[in-house]
Regions:
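Amphipathic alpha-helical segments that mediate coupling or scaffolding at interfaces
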Residues: 15, 28, 44-45, 56-57, ...
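Hydrophobic transmembrane alpha-helices and their membrane-interface caps
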Residues: 39-46, 50-106, 164
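Residue-level signature of catalytic and energy-coupling elements of molecular machines
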Residues: 25, 40, 57, 61, ...
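Short helix-loop junctions at transmembrane helix boundaries
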Residues: 18, 68-84, 144-162
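Helix-loop junctions and hydrophobic alpha-helical segments within the transmembrane domains
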Residues: 15, 22, 26, 101, ...
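Transmembrane alpha-helices and their membrane-interface boundaries in multi-pass membrane transporters
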Residues: 90, 94-104, 126-145, 154-187
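Internal alpha-helical transmembrane segments of multi-pass membrane proteins, especially GPCRs
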Residues: 26-34, 58, 83-86, 122, ...
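Juxtamembrane "pre-transmembrane" interface segments
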Residues: 1-42, 142, 149, 153
Length: 187
């Protein structure tokens, strides 16, 4: 379309095919994501039993999948910047779940019934987990609103993506993680 408007002595060539670059980066992201999940499982398995490590590790892919879905619903396209934001947040999305699982194990060790332990592990830690999540979100979010011009257009998706992923991580930790603990970690 552009070639029709331009004079005949002007050439238009494709330098970078953005969808191709994003597809390649998406592949790299999933490789890094797999490595991160394996590292989380390995580290947690050193400290906790296999089932506990598995529940903590499930939180990451669930959070990332829901984050991708929300980004899609909001019309935020997958591009290099949003992928970079997902890589930035990758290690953070399991933290909340690990804390809830650890608290659940403590409660069960104190002879509290499984259902009560699951409920208490989420409700007692809601404020501290929310505060920690909010602190991280508030450290990224100003980038979306304080920058102007081309810089804003380029960078604004990092804080938005990070904020969505951390909010999803918070919800997964408070709702899904205790439920999985109750069903899979009975003594």
């Amino acid at each position: 379309e552009v070639k029709e408007i331009l004079p005949s002595d002007v050439q238009v060539n494709t330098i970078v095919d953005q969808p191709e670059v994003v597809d390649m980066n998406l592949g790299h992201f999933f490789i890094e994501f797999g490595i991160a999940i394996a590292a989380v499982i390995l580290v947690v398995m050193l400290l906790l039993p296999f089932r506990v490590a598995t529940i903590s590790a499930i939180a990451a892919p669930v959070t990332i999948a829901v984050t991708f879905a929300i980004l899609n619903l909001l019309g935020i396209e997958m591009h290099q910047v949003s992928l970079a934001a997902m890589i930035i947040v990758l290690g953070m999305v399991v933290d909340d779940a690990i804390i809830v699982v650890d608290n659940y194990i403590e409660k069960v060790d104190e002879k509290i019934p499984s259902w009560t332990a699951a409920w208490q592990s989420a409700t007692q830690l809601m404020v501290p987990i929310f505060t920690a999540t909010l602190t991280i979100v508030l450290s990224f979010l100003p980038l979306a609103f304080t920058l102007t011009g081309l810089t804003r257009e380029f960078v604004q998706w990092i804080p938005i993506t990070v904020s969505i992923a951390l909010a999803v991580s918070f919800l997964v930790a408070l709702f899904l993680t205790p439920y999985m603990c109750y069903h899979f970690l009975k003594k």
